[in-house]
A protein has these predicted regions:
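Glycine-rich phosphate-binding loop and adjoining helix at the ATP-binding site
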Residues: 114-216, 351-362
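Short, acidic Gly/Pro/Ser/Thr-rich loop/turn segments
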Residues: 100-102, 159-161, 227
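ATP-binding/phosphotransfer module of carbohydrate and carboxylate kinases, centering on a glycine-rich
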Residues: 1-71, 75-118, 122-148, 267-406
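Short, acidic, Ser/Thr-enriched surface-loop or helix-capping motifs
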Residues: 108, 162, 231-232
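A short, compositionally biased micro-patch
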Residues: 86-88, 97, 155, 223, ...
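Glycine/GP-enriched mid-protein hinge/lid loop-to-helix segment characteristic of carbohydrate kinases
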Residues: 5-6, 116, 126, 176-177, ...
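Short glycine-rich anion-binding loops that position phosphate/pyrophosphate groups of nucleotides
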Residues: 157-160, 223-225, 345
């Protein structure tokens, strides 16, 4: 039987030009991460020769992407100064937007915060009101540098169409229609806008700010909803239909509870902070009247849990067990061995984490004799709130690197 011919254009080799482009991308990424490096440092990190690095940085300087700074430094031999990303770039206003809160900070060309951190509770009832809240936060962010050119990078809770920059569905919001965030904000503010999911923001922050050295990982955000994002082969995995990482909508129970997505028994109905509060109140109503139902929020649940309230303890451990089992089922197909947890449920602490871990690590395919760094680890994320929001600025960096020579 004759071999089938390769599909035209499906397999492309790397000619010398593409190798140079790859190396330029690598150097630019290092400069963004390090905030500045010498030629010798770049050569050491990339394992390229000094002459090869010289050609790369000279080309990047000529293109206006990189600048050379003279630095007073006692050294033997020639010292070519420090190379940094060009200052001829707009600032970036980074935002995280949910139906109840907006957080924002402005960063400079090196992705260093240059404004006050905005953390504002909001109560929009319509998409138009949400747009007004976003614009108000942008104005507050730009108070320190009102005349500086800028661009927007917005992380949105829920499903996002990244191609057109729209919020397709925002759970917990009092509306159901799509919001064309990119179009509306670009038309109103006359700036460039990128929009993505809030879990992607966390994954970008972990990738660029927490030094994972190219490891695959999953970020799991367990808050009033549950979402996730994956870094695979150093790239954020999004999927074709913008639905990747929707672990919160795995069906885990026939509990009769309808999720915000319209289906019954999703993980969010069992393990999110909203679900924990509802389950506690349901159980507490049958036990004793210790809690005022109308004012009960997740912080109240955490206090009860930390004070060894038996109902809160049981509800939290049940949720952790289901969450761990779901993680196992979800991740065993991808064989990702690093899971990083964020969200308000992390306030439940180490016992909650241990229960999740015990369920997640029941993996018959994991080699007990594997290297420590190859074993599965479930841990809390350690980035600060500001660092997480700054993560959205790297959406622009990744776009620049992807389009470096297109």
């Amino acid at each position: 039987m004759p071999n089938k011919p390769f599909q035209s254009g499906a397999h492309k080799g790397l000619n010398n030009q593409k190798v140079r482009h790859y190396n330029c991308r690598l150097v630019m990424a290092l400069l963004y991460k390090s905030k500045g490096m010498t030629k010798s440092e770049l050569a050491r990190e990339t394992q390229l020769s000094i002459p090869a690095i010289s050609k790369i940085v000279d080309a990047l300087v000529e293109q206006g992407r990189v600048e050379n700074f003279s630095v007073s430094k006692a050294t033997k031999g020639n010292f070519g100064g420090l190379y940094k990303v060009s200052s001829d770039r707009p600032y970036t206003v980074c935002m995280s937007v949910s139906p109840t809160r907006i957080q924002a900070v402005m960063v400079d060309n090196e992705m260093t915060p240059s404004s006050d951190f905005i953390d504002q509770a909001i109560t929009p009832q319509t998409p138009d009101e949400l747009i007004e809240d976003i614009v108000t936060a942008i104005v507050a962010c730009r108070q320190s540098k009102p005349n500086t050119s800028y661009r927007l990078s917005i992380a949105v809770h829920g499903q996002v169409d990244t191609h057109v920059g729209s919020s397709m569905r925002m759970p917990q919001a009092p509306w159901t229609q799509t919001i064309e965030l990119k179009y509306l904000l670009e038309q109103r503010l006359l700036v460039e806008v990128l929009v993505d999911n809030d879990c992607v923001m966390l994954a970008l922050a972990e990738k660029w700010l927490d030094g994972h050295h190219g490891e695959d990982f999953c970020v799991l955000n367990v808050d009033y909803g549950i979402g996730s994002s994956f870094l695979i082969h150093n790239d954020i995995y999004r999927g074709k239909m913008f639905g990747s990482g929707q672990i919160g909508h795995i069906k885990v129970a026939n509990n009769g509870i309808i999720c915000g997505c319209g289906r019954e028994g999703c993980l969010e109905t069992e393990a999110s902070s909203t679900a924990l509060c509802k389950q506690y109140l349901s159980r507490q109503e049958n036990a004793s009247k210790l809690v005022h139902i109308d004012d009960f929020v997740f912080d109240d649940f955490v206090k009860l849990y930390q004070n060894d309230d038996p109902i809160a303890q049981e509800v939290a451990m049940h949720a952790a067990t289901i969450l761990g089992q779901s993680l196992y089922n979800f991740l065993i197909t991808l064989n990702i061995n690093k899971i990083i947890l964020y969200g308000n449920t992390c306030a439940l602490g180490e016992c909650w984490l241990k229960t999740i871990t015990q369920q997640t690590l029941i993996n018959p395919f994991e080699d007990e004799n594997a290297r420590k760094q190859d074993l599965t680890v479930v841990s809390f994320g350690h980035l600060t709130q500001i660092e997480r929001i700054v993560g959205m600025s790297y959406l622009w960096v990744e776009q620049e690197l992807d389009n470096l020579y297109t």
